[in-house]
Structure formats: structure tokens, C-alpha cells
Amino acid sequence: MSSRFPYNNLTYGPVNETKQDSLTRAITEADEYFKGSVSAVPFMKLIASAETDYGRHNDETALSYGPFQIDPIRYFDITQAPGRMTEKHKKRLSKANEYLRKKLNDPNFNISKLAVYNPETKDYVKDSRNLKYLRNPDVGAVLTRLALKQRPEQIPQGIENMVSGYEKIWAPKWSQSKDAGILDKKRKEAKDKFVKYNTEESVMAENDKVNSAFNF
């Protein structure tokens, strides 16, 4: 379904879409807009599957924001951290604003001003968060694609490589565990959730080769 249709409070997407439909559309369109040499769609779907059961989370109780669970430090690194604002990345942020202003029908949208980060607390300044946009799947998909653009690694292809990439690149809390049993359990959960929610992509992912998707 085209994103030109009216949005339901700009939270999930066109009014006739489910949350999962909106998430799939958001991922596909964001990857198309910030296209690399290979698709990042399967990997982004794995991240969303592992983080929120592919958008089946409760925004009010989730620890971070949106279907990809963008936390304060990650948001700061993507949009505000002075040391990461290369000229190339600044251009990406400008393109992200151009894209999302049209998609959200908000000429004042600024992806770098959705929250104010406090480096001392490693959290957002109280009352600085724009929850409507931080929870929006289109915004989350763009932030996720931008985060991948910042990385030097290749976009992982194939389920096993994607699970390893999720652990290394997205670095969920469990990735810091020293317990091999916990690590194996969480890796299996990430894989199983991706297969459960993205059957077609799980088959395609096994057949894809590893190529770079960071040539912007």
C-alpha cells in the first residue's frame, strides 16, 4: 500500500495498515531511499523481529523507542554526536529530513531534534522527547538505515550471518553476557523470531551472498 494515503496519527502509517504492514513498508521504502549495493531489508527485519517481535511491542512499556528500539545513545550517535557528523553523514541526515518531511507531511520535521541527549545521564533530557516521531516506524526505519550507513561492516546476508551481525552491530544487552548458554539462547531466539515473522525473507536470506551496502 502506498504511503501517500492518510496517516493514523502519524504513528504507524496508512489507516488501513496493521502495525506489521506499516513496519514492512517503512523498512522497504527506507532501504530503497538509502539504497546500497545490496538490500538491507532482511537484516532490518531481523533487528525488528528480535527487538520487538516485529512491531508487536507496547510503546508505553517498551524500554526504548519504536520497532527497532532506538535507545538514547544510539539516537545521539546517529543524529547528534559531533565526532560522527562527517560531511557524508550530514548529507544523509539532510536527505532523511527531505524524505520524512514529505512522508509525514510535516515541513518542520528534523530528525536531529526529536530529543535532547544528556551525556552525563546517558538519557534524554526530561520532557525533550517527541514520542510521536520516536515511535513512528518510518522514522525508526530511517534511523536504523542511517545507523547501518555509519558502520564499516558489510550488511550481513544469510540468517546465521545476520544473527551474528545483530549481536555485533546492534549490540543488544544480552550480547555483553559472558555466559555461553545465555548467548546461544538469545542467538537462537533472534533467528527463530526472524523466521517466524519473515518466512519469505528467511529463505531469501540464506541464498544471498555477503556484499557491502554502505556505498552511498
Segment roles from a protein language model:
Residues 1-8, 14-21, 201-216:
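N-terminal secretory targeting signals
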Residues 5-184:
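Catalytic glycan-binding domains that act on GlcNAc-containing polysaccharides
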Residues 163-216:
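Long, amphipathic alpha-helical surface segments
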